Amino acid sequence: MPVTTQQLIQWKQQGRSIVALTAWDYTIAQILDGAGVDLILVGDSMAVMLGYKTTLPITLEEMLHHAKAVCRGVQRALVVVDLPFLTYQESIPQAINSAGRILKETGAQAVKLEGGYPAMVDTINRLVQAGIPVMGHVGLTPQSVHQLGLRQQGKTQETAQRILNEAIALEQAGVFSIVLEHIPADLAMQITQKVNIPTIGIGAGSHCDGQVLVTSDVLGLSERQPPFAKVYTNLRETITKAVQDYAAEVRDRQFPE
């Protein structure tokens, strides 16, 4: 049975951890879905896979293109798509149009927006009223890289309280889940205990209701990984060796036999 947003909330109540990873193409999405991943995020981190230095340049059209491919490969997992930078911050109508296009054109079940400041809370509330499921995202928000950098957030009492307040406000606005990125584990635990919706951690300790990582980091494909990522295999090395072996056989006329 396909995973739903309501099922994620039930899993929090039952104490069942939620498994999430990113995907940007049909093949990886199919593999993740078949392996039992609960939530697949078509993240704007795809920008880095396309050669950009940050997530900012990725466009809505690029996200739509890749989200369609991901959805074609998924039968069970809940698919959530990031709204890219400046496709939802300008106005509520812009956000509704962008999010609506993602749901209508890709087959995804939800969108994710960054930030919990008052204007964003209002935007999310309107999206939810329009029938669009929304996942929130607080802590380190990569679309604010030029304001906040990529350092851990919430280390001071003031910033920790702000992030906690944002998470509570997002729940009240109607999000079905919140990503907690690169914040202290004790703050993530406090938020997880305070809200009734599942928290999905990335660099936020082990007390969240679920975990998400970038799949290229997990598989060892990335040139560099964030400090909180765990590399489970080194596909970059495996692929390099396979290509070198193929090239050697072609040059030596050993392939094809």
Swiss-Prot record:
EC number: 2.1.2.11
GO cellular component: cytoplasm
Catalytic activity: 3-methyl-2-oxobutanoate + (6R)-5,10-methylene-5,6,7,8-tetrahydrofolate + H2O = 2-dehydropantoate + (6S)-5,6,7,8-tetrahydrofolate
Any matching Pfam family: Pantoate_transf
Residues the record lists as binding Mg(2+): 44, 82, 114
Binding residues annotated for 3-methyl-2-oxobutanoate, in chain numbering: 44-45, 82, 112
Single annotated GO MF: magnesium ion binding
Location of this chain's protein in the cell: Cytoplasm
UniProt keywords, alphabetically: Cytoplasm, Magnesium, Metal-binding, Pantothenate biosynthesis, Transferase
Taxonomy, superkingdom: Bacteria
InterPro entries to which the protein is assigned, alphabetical: Pantoate_hydroxy_MeTrfase, Pyrv/PenolPyrv_kinase-like_dom, Pyrv_kinase-like_dom_sf
Active site (catalytic residues): 181 (proton acceptor)
Names of the cofactor(s): Mg(2+)
Signal peptide bounds: none
Pathway annotation: Cofactor biosynthesis; (R)-pantothenate biosynthesis; (R)-pantoate from 3-methyl-2-oxobutanoate: step 1/2
Paired cysteines (S-S): none
Cofactor note: Binds 1 Mg(2+) ion per subunit.
Main location: cytoplasm
GO terms, biological process: pantothenate biosynthetic process
Its biological purpose: Catalyzes the reversible reaction in which hydroxymethyl group from 5,10-methylenetetrahydrofolate is transferred onto alpha-ketoisovalerate to form ketopantoate.
Record text on subunit structure and interactions: Homodecamer; pentamer of dimers.
Similarity field: Belongs to the PanB family.
Protein name from the UniProt record: 3-methyl-2-oxobutanoate hydroxymethyltransferase
Species annotation: Nostoc sp. (strain PCC 7120 / SAG 25.82 / UTEX 2576)
Gene, per the UniProt record: panB
